[in-house]
């Protein structure tokens, strides 16, 4: 017998999207020039000054060795319209064939926003495994200056042409970034299920207008299976990968988590859709200036995931998530998010932002600002209660 989702799918046009190439391995960055020369003879390389100091030499030597000219642009830390316009001007003035984004999610989102609308090849080289930005056709835009507030998420008509992940580079990054990637990735198991149950689309579209996808296509059931594999991989390898990251070494578990954080997570969210966890995670950015220390995307989404689990899955699943999250160091309370003096006014700011997100539109139910605030407060109390039973591991 066919399940209801399969039967319903006969009435829809469905779609699936993915990056053109995904390449991962220890030391692969030294082959970057060989890999990208298929896209042309001249590149714009975008990274911040710290990343250039760490891996810029390997990137530049590889491009020179394989005959790829390049102009190196230092990223200004925030993926904003101001920064996108600045880098686009440099790319067009130099007649480059490709944009190579080297660094974290904001760098790569900026590189995509420069390359894809201008029909340049987009090559993503993550130096941390903290988000699924490398594989997706989405850029998240923030205000200036850094750290900015969330403005919008824009959709592109194609995914990056290539993603090159050097696990030796990933292993040398602070272990916190790996945990953040897992925090982002774990949300997709719950969000994909919620989106399917609501019969809503993901981020695959028939057409694109004004940086927006229009005529969304319904997903196949593949994202559900990817999200399940993703969550199982995080549970099986997360703790061991964190130990490897703390020691700055590449192990099979670290390879599996990098693959999960980057490829599996990207395929799951883009084809399966995002929901309440990301609505809350993104909206918590309105409180970033109060957070001490500043929290990363995956940390805020981890708290959002706890809220979604309590709203849709119940206490048993919430406790399982808290235990796992604390085992790798992720926050599950306001205090762990660096919000030691959070007020109702603060939470209502978050709630109003939640209701303005595209993720909110994918919910199977309507929730008021009062309900969103109440859900966050409940998640905080549950996080405090059960977090004591499963102490939070340090990142380093």
Provide a role label for each language-model segment.
Residues 1-98, 334:
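ATP/NTP phosphate-donor binding region
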Residues 2-8, 314-396:
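C-terminal charged capping/lid subdomain of soluble metabolic enzymes
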Residues 20, 116-219:
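A glycine/threonine-rich phosphate-anchoring loop and its flanking beta-alpha core
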Residues 29, 52-56, 81-84, 106-113, ...:
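Short glycine/serine/threonine-rich phosphate/pyrophosphate-binding segments
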Residues 37, 64, 68, 92, ...:
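Generic secondary-structure signature for well-ordered alpha-helical cores
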Residues 91-129:
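A short, small-residue-rich loop immediately preceding and capping a beta-strand
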Residues 205-207, 211-330:
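Active-site segments that bind and position negatively charged phosphate/pyrophosphate groups
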């Amino acid at each position: 017998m066919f399940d209801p989702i399969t039967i319903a799918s006969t009435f829809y046009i469905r779609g699936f999207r993915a990056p053109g190439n995904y390449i991962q391995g220890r030391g692969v960055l030294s082959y970057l020039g060989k890999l990208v020369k298929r896209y042309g003879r001249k590149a714009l390389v975008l990274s911040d000054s710290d990343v250039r100091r760490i891996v810029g030499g390997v990137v530049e030597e590889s491009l020179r060795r394989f005959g790829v000219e390049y102009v190196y642009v230092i990223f200004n830390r925030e993926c904003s319209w101001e920064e996108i316009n600045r880098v686009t001007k440099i790319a067009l003035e130099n007649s480059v064939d490709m944009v190579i984004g080297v660094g974290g999610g904001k760098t790569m989102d900026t590189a995509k926003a420069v390359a894809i609308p201008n029909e340049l090849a987009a090559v993503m080289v993550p130096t941390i495994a903290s988000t699924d930005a490398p594989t997706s056709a989405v850029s998240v835009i923030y205000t200036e200056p850094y750290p900015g507030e969330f403005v919008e998420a824009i959709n592109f008509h194609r995914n990056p042409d290539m993603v090159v992940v050097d696990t030796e580079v990933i292993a040398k990054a602070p272990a916190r970034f790996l945990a953040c990637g897992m925090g982002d990735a774990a949300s997709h198991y719950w969000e994909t299920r919620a989106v399917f149950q609501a019969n809503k689309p993901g981020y695959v579209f028939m057409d694109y207008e004004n940086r927006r996808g229009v005529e969304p296509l319904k997903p196949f059931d593949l994202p559900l299976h990817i999200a399940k594999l993703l969550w199982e991989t995080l549970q099986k390898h997360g703790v061991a990968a964190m130990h490897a990251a703390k020691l700055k070494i590449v192990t099979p578990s670290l390879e599996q988590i990098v693959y999960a954080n980057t490829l599996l997570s990207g395929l799951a969210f883009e084809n399966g859709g995002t929901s309440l966890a990301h609505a809350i995670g993104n909206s918590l950015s309105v409180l970033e200036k109060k957070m001490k220390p500043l929290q990363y995307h995956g940390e805020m989404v981890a708290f959002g995931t706890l809220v979604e689990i309590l709203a849709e899955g119940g206490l048993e699943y919430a406790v399982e998530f808290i235990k796992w999250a604390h085992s790798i160091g992720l926050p599950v309370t306001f205090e762990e998010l660096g919000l030691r003096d959070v007020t109702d006014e603060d939470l209502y700011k978050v709630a109003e932002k939640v209701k303005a997100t595209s993720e909110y539109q994918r919910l199977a139910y309507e929730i008021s600002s009062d309900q969103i605030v109440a859900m966050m407060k409940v998640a905080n109390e549950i996080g405090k209660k059960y977090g004591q039973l499963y102490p939070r591991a340090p990142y380093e």
